[in-house]
Amino acid sequence: MAAEQPLNGAFYGPSVPPPAPKGYYRRGHGRGCGCCLLSLFVKVIISLIVILGVAALIFWLIVRPRAIKFHVTDASLTRFDHTSPDNILRYNLALTVPVRNPNKRIGLYYDRIEAHAYYEGKRFSTITLTPFYQGHKNTTVLTPTFQGQNLVIFNAGQSRTLNAERISGVYNIEIKFRLRVRFKLGDLKFRRIKPKVDCDDLRLPLSTSNGTTTTSTVFPIKCDFDF
């Protein structure tokens, strides 16, 4: 075997590939974009809330909307009889109810007006009044009349109350109005709302055949208006 020859010069072997370049990576770049978008979204929402709040304040300062006012100024109860065992309630009740629009710039469209009569929590009559438009600073007088008969079943406690009030000649009757109203400001008409009006403190004396009453009652009675 021939002896190995020492290397007298440089060794030229296969070329060694250069090291791969290190990738450039910005830590948190994707997260930073998400935070920026979220921050921008929050700023836009806050700006919209502030703009709407300022617009609502300006609108209120200019228009100064006020609640509609309902009062019962007169009532005539000429019949209120409940018979058994058929449980028929016969009634005749007429009311005078002025409705006041105190607003200077807002008109009101009463698209639907329902009046409900209750005794001891039992509804015994419902009527629908004629729709109308009410202008600025205007009073419109409603005259709902409940007349007829209906099946009304009272429990023992309600029957005792009815008997006691029959003896006294004064009946505690509730009138509730359910409305559909639109507001008009200039040429603009706003969406329909459904306010509720409750006239709960009506202690009405039964009128006698000669037109007198068994006891007196105090008018006007203010009704509760709730949007």
UniProtKB/Swiss-Prot annotation:
Expressed in senescing leaves. It is a single-pass membrane protein. Keywords: Cell membrane, Glycoprotein, Membrane, Plant defense, Transmembrane, Transmembrane helix. The lineage of its organism: Eukaryota, Viridiplantae, Streptophyta, Embryophyta, Tracheophyta. Induction: By ethylene, abscisic acid (ABA), beta-aminobutyric acid (BABA), spermine, dark and infection with the cucumber mosaic virus (CMV). Induced by infection with the fungal pathogen Botrytis cinerea. It comes from the Eukaryota. It comes from Arabidopsis thaliana. One of its GO terms (biological process) is leaf senescence. Glycans are attached at residues 138, 210. One of its GO terms (cellular component) is chloroplast. This is NDR1/HIN1-like protein 10. May play a role in plant immunity. It is found in: Cell membrane. The chain crosses the membrane at residues 42-62. Its main location: membrane.
